[in-house]
């Protein structure tokens, strides 16, 4: 584990062959379920440092780095990966630093997206279209995280376990068990003949707006085999679906038109097109519940997981919204 002191900034600089300038500093930026992001200020240079809470492997990281380098060379804005000691992109922290793994990237200056901003709906559609047009063939099978879901009994079991620990989200989980099962019924295996390498998490939190107005895509750790149809469906839900079960129809149309104009091949065929979005939501929910209920997990991780569970349960999409977006996409794309 690293912190914002000079010792940690020196450790990071050493791991990646950077000069530890006087005054070098690590500034916390954000955290997610899988890791924490820091900004490293080293003299005139700035870098993004990702501290991973869970183990990764060098081979998959190298595949990701090669893919993002391909996209960057074609004009996609993203934080390129930088290697460290021994040419390795993944640097392991010593047991004395409580373990963990580090990645280093070029820093990108930008601001979070404003979902109501003029031109954003078209901009994200164009970006997604270009990403899919530039995508490389899938390098292997789909990870089950993206097209399988927990068994129907899982949600009641987790709710019971949460009640036993007095967890604040227990009743919300129990009350949503029926909806979770209905959503799970829409998840099917991805067709192998339409797989390409996708980002697989095109959430607004993973996109920045640069000073030029260009969009930059962050967090490529999960890039891998997926169907463009399903990534497009998830994008519509992430960017234009509302918690009250409605959608911004005009924005959806602008995104879809720009997606197709940008070369995107995706087509929402039916409600099952939302399968990847739903599988990720449900698997994330189960994974966070496992962390929150684990007495051996770090208190910081348990608290974060509990917060994510409550947020995810509150934002589950209504089946009617999925049907509406499917019909709207069919009418727009033909």
Stretches found by the model and what they are:
Residues 229-264, 278-296:
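Active-site activation/catalytic loop segments of kinase-like enzymes and analogous catalytic loops
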Residues 266-277:
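All-alpha amphipathic helical-bundle segments outside canonical DNA-binding/catalytic cores
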